[in-house]
Structures are given as C-alpha cells and as structure tokens.
Design a protein with these regions (language model features):
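Glycine-/small-residue-enriched transmembrane alpha-helix faces in small-molecule transporters
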Residues: 1-41, 75, 83, 145-171, ...
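Loop-to-transmembrane-helix transition segments
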Residues: 10-20, 42, 60-84, 150-158, ...
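Juxtamembrane C-cap of transmembrane helices in multi-pass membrane transport proteins
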Residues: 18-34, 82-91, 99, 165-176, ...
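C-terminal transmembrane-helix exit sites in multi-pass transporters
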Residues: 53-60, 103-128, 251-271
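Helix-helix packing/entry segments at the starts of transmembrane helices
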Residues: 96-102, 169-190, 223-259
Length: 301
C-alpha cells in the first residue's frame, strides 16, 4: 500500500509551528539548574504521563516488532537530547540549533535508498539556498573561539542521532499515530537517559519551582507539543521537505532573542532569515508540482 504525501500548506504551517516550539529548547536548557543529561532525562520522564491518555487507545495496534523499533527510535532520540544539551555548555544556542538540524545530509540519501523518494530537480538548489541562509544568519551571532569547536562537534553528532529517530519514526508513521510514537519511544529514551545521567553526572533530583519550571517547559514545548506535532506532520509531509523546514529553527531562535532579550538583529541576520524562507519556499514549490508517493517497506510478521 502506498501513502501519498502531497505537502499541503496547512501541514507546512503546522511543522513550522512545531519548530517554533522546539526552538525554545536552548533557552530552557541553559536556564535549568540541573546538569544537561539530567535535564534531558526529566524532560522525557515528565512527558510520559501527559502522553499516556492520548496514546492509550492506540497502543493495541502495535505489534511486538513495532514496539522494539520504537524503543530503538527512543535510544536515538536520547542520544540526540544528551549531545544537544551538552553542546550548549560549549557553543552558542544558534550554532547548536544549526548543527543539530543539519539532518538533511543524512536524511536525503537514506530516504532515497529506504523510502524510494525521488529528489525533485530543484530540491538540492532549494536546500543549498536554505543552508546558505542559515550560515549567513550564524555569522552575525557567533563569537568564534577554540572552545566552541567541541560544542559544535557535539551538536553535529546530535544531528546524526536525530536523523536516526526521524527516519525510524517516519517509517512507522504510515501506520501508527504520532502520540504512540512519542509515548513508546519515550520509554527507550528515558531508560537510556537514566543510565547515561547516572554514569556521567550522577542522578539529580529537582527541588522547588525554580528548578522544576524549566524542566516542565522542556517537557511541554519540546517533548509533548514540538516532537509530537513534528511526528504528526511527517505523515503528511515528505521527509526531504521536513528536514529542510527544520533548518528554520535557528532563524526562529534568533527572533525569540530579539523579542525576549531585546537582542537587535543585524542586517546580515535579517538577510539570512529571508534567504532561509526563500529556500524553504523553493522546495515547497517543487513538491507542489507533483505528489510524491512513498512506498511502504514490507515487513515480516
């Protein structure tokens, strides 16, 4: 059976909204009083009871194989969360957002090999324009120094883990709701993060509202709303376009900085944002020319 993903405008808007929620992550991670991996652990842990009422009635549709695949996806997401959170202690929020979202270079070849998605004639041109815009944006925000290189490396590694999660959840989204994907994969994430936090940082317990609210913000904005909404859009938007839209996250984070912290955007930053949006528009225009059929992979029972 084939699933048609024709990239309707409403789902493009919903995915941009998901990215807007995800763009709050860097600010909340830096505010958190807990260590980075512990912060990620509580982000996922607190999300499970919130997702359960939504996912419960759909859990029966899962096979044992589906459950194992989702737990594996959760391990990839845990790797992304851990490395992403750690990167904020070494590099800027803008750089971390940029490098973590460079999943395009991983996702595009694998989507072609696994899902048989054809790459439109001008898709790579649109992606290149978007990436150029992101780099132009970053040049106006980042203070380059030697210590930031390690943080950049962590964020880049996080992008590989996120690409793994994106591909695995995309594969199952043809049959399984996004709430089930986030709920079941959350168990894989929380177990992985618990073990990693205990070994690397020592398990920490938040005390008081001042330590809890950043964790709850991460849970609600990222784990429940952001990733859940993004997973939902993956059922309606091709994975290539989805990966390019994710590159708008640094632009949205820059806008947050302008309104929340009164950080003025330079002319170069504004130019970068405009170029990013132009690249995304070019990619969407190509997909509007022809609906893309994504072949489901036949799985053994």
């Amino acid at each position: 059976m084939n699933t048609v993903r024709n990239n309707e405008t409403r789902y493009i808007i919903l995915e941009l909204l998901a990215i807007a929620f995800l763009a709050t992550g860097g600010i909340l991670v830096k505010i958190s009083a807990l260590s980075p991996i512990n912060t990620g652990f509580y982000r996922v842990l607190f999300s499970l009871p919130l997702l359960f009422p939504i996912a419960y009635k759909h859990l029966k549709q899962l096979s044992k194989r589906d459950t194992v695949i989702l737990l594996l996806a959760g391990i990839f997401l845990a790797g992304d969360i851990s490395l992403w959170n750690l990167s904020f202690h070494y590099t800027s929020v803008a750089n971390a957002n940029l490098l973590t979202n460079l999943t395009t270079f991983t996702v595009i070849p694998f989507s072609y090999l696994i899902f048989k998605e054809r790459i439109p004639k001008f898709f790579l041109a649109g992606a290149a324009i978007t990436i150029a815009g992101v780099f132009i944006l970053i040049t106006g925000k980042t203070d380059t120094n030697g210590s930031s290189l390690f943080g950049d490396f962590l964020a880049l590694c996080a992008s590989l883990f996120y690409a793994g999660f994106l591909l695995i959840s995309y594969r199952l989204r043809n049959r399984i709701s996004s709430s089930v994907i986030m709920f079941v994969s959350g168990f894989g994430s929380v177990i992985t993060l618990l073990i990693t936090a205990s070994l690397v940082e020592g398990l920490q317990v938040p005390h008081g509202a001042s330590q809890l609210w950043p964790l709850l913000g991460l849970t609600l904005f990222l784990q429940v709303i952001g990733h859940n909404l993004l997973a939902h859009c993956q059922g309606k938007v091709t994975v290539n376009l989805s990966s390019v839209i994710c590159l708008s996250q640094p632009a949205i984070a820059s806008i947050y900085s302008f309104f929340i912290f009164s950080e003025n955007l330079s002319a170069i930053e504004v130019l970068g944002i405009i170029i990013i949006m132009a690249g995304v528009y070019l990619v969407k225009a190509q997909y509007n020319l022809k609906s893309i059929k994504v072949c489901n992979i036949t799985e053994d029972s």
